[in-house]
């Protein structure tokens, strides 16, 4: 027997009546002879099947609505216990964390390292304190960027092919890094 494509889930039927008169159930297929059934009987059977499919389709819709209501009810069960009713959605929290992480790890460390490079010997006490605090706050991001940022001008000797090569004449390379105790800030300009 066909179930008209049903899922096998039905809404409960009403309880039978408690009346005492017996019911006689007649089968819709009363075949008393071995001959071919007439057209009216086939027409009645087709109408019954169509009606059953319509009823089952309505039951499926009702079941889907009930299932949706149950899922909506158990979506946030902790709200009834904790009383937190205005919690942020997970998508907005993840988006905020992503924006802050990009700013913390990708945007600020190169800016801070360039600021340290440019103002290294020209800073006063307050600027040195600010630079220290920014380095302290953004230390993980600076550690990630440090191997990739190199502000020194390489190669210093035009004869060197790679920055890690040894120069042929080391005395010809101008060294400006050891002037600090007696240097003026202009001595450290990298032009």
UniProtKB/Swiss-Prot annotation:
Where is it located? Plastid, Chloroplast thylakoid membrane
GO cellular component term, pick one: thylakoid membrane
Which domain of life does this protein belong to?
A: Eukaryota
Q: What is its EC number?
A: 7.1.1.-
Enzyme's top EC category: translocase
Query: Major location, coarse class?
Result: plastid
Entry's InterPro entries?
A: NADH-quinone_OxRdatse_su_L
Q: Which reaction does it catalyse?
A: a plastoquinone + NADH + (n+1) H(+)(in) = a plastoquinol + NAD(+) + n H(+)(out); a plastoquinone + NADPH + (n+1) H(+)(in) = a plastoquinol + NADP(+) + n H(+)(out)
Q: Name one GO molecular function term.
A: quinone binding
How is loss of this gene reflected in the phenotype of the organism? Answer: Malfunction of the NDH complex.
Annotated membrane topology is: Multi-pass membrane protein
Asked whether the UniProt record includes NAD among its keywords, one would answer: yes
What stretch of residues directs this protein to its organelle as a transit peptide? 1-46
Keywords of the record, alphabetical order, are: Chloroplast, Membrane, NAD, NADP, Plastid, Plastoquinone, Quinone, Thylakoid, Transit peptide, Translocase, Transmembrane, Transmembrane helix, Transport
Q: Look up the record and give one Gene Ontology term from the biological process aspect.
A: NADH dehydrogenase complex (plastoquinone) assembly
| Pfam families in the record | NdhL
The UniProt transmembrane annotation reads: 61-81, 93-113, 129-149
Q: What is the purpose of this protein? A: NDH shuttles electrons from NAD(P)H:plastoquinone, via FMN and iron-sulfur (Fe-S) centers, to quinones in the photosynthetic chain and possibly in a chloroplast respiratory chain. The immediate electron acceptor for the enzyme in this species is believed to be plastoquinone. Couples the redox reaction to proton translocation, and thus conserves the redox energy in a proton gradient.
Similarity comment text for this entry: Belongs to the NDH complex subunit L family.
Quaternary assembly: Part of the chloroplast NDH complex, composed of a mixture of chloroplast and nucleus encoded subunits. Component of the NDH subcomplex A, at least composed of ndhH, ndhI, ndhJ, ndhK, ndhL, ndhM, ndhN and ndhO.
Q: What's the protein here called?
A: NAD(P)H-quinone oxidoreductase subunit L, chloroplastic
Q: Which organism is it from?
A: Arabidopsis thaliana (Mouse-ear cress)
Its lineage reads:
Eukaryota, Viridiplantae, Streptophyta, Embryophyta, Tracheophyta
């Amino acid at each position: 027997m066909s179930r008209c494509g049903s899922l096998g889930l039905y809404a409960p039927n009403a309880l039978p009546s408690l009346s005492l008169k017996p019911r006689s159930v007649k089968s819709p297929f009363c075949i008393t002879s071995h001959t071919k059934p007439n057209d009216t009987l086939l027409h009645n059977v087709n109408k019954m099947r169509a009606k059953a499919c319509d009823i089952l389709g309505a039951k499926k819709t009702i079941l889907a609505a009930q299932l949706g209501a149950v899922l909506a009810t158990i979506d946030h069960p902790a709200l009834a216990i904790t009383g937190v009713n205005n919690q942020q959605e997970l998508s907005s929290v993840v988006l905020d964390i992503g924006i802050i992480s990009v700013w913390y790890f990708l945007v600020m460390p190169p800016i801070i390292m360039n600021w340290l490079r440019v103002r290294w010997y020209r800073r006063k006490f307050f600027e040195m304190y600010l630079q220290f605090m920014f380095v302290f706050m953004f230390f993980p991001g600076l550690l990630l960027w440090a191997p990739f940022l190199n502000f020194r001008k390489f190669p210093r000797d035009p004869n060197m092919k790679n920055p890690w090569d040894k120069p042929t004449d080391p005395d010809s390379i101008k060294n400006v890094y050891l002037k600090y105790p007696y240097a003026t800030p202009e001595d450290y300009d990298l032009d």
